[in-house]
Amino acid sequence: MSKNTIEISFLHRQLAMILTSWGLTSIVMGITLLFFDVDFLRSLSIQFLIWGIVNFLLGIFPLIRNSIPNRKRLYKILLINSFLDVIYLIVSFLLIFQIVFQGESAVGHGFGVMIQGLFLLVFDTYYGIRFKRIED
């Protein structure tokens, strides 16, 4: 294995472990917040549960497969995801400021999307840059 292949494999595993951990943390937070009888917190919990399940699954499958990804392909995926994360943040502001929907529930969903979207924006951008810098 070349030095670059080892670095790609290490970064990919690191990325998957962080995403899996974030997903599990979000699921636990989502379940915990479900016990509160407040619309804002219930809506926040739904967002944490949905995003948590998706992030957990996206993180666990690469760990199970344990394969070495194509660097360019992974970089492109992370770049596209970074742009999607910006869209998630725009949607979160529409919900928080009640531009589309009204009520405490909309604000809770907005903050849920904002928290998850901010994490993913930093995460996807950081790892996208890291994968881009590795030479073929």
Segment roles from a protein language model:
Residues 2-136:
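Polytopic alpha-helical membrane-helix bundles and their juxtamembrane interface segments
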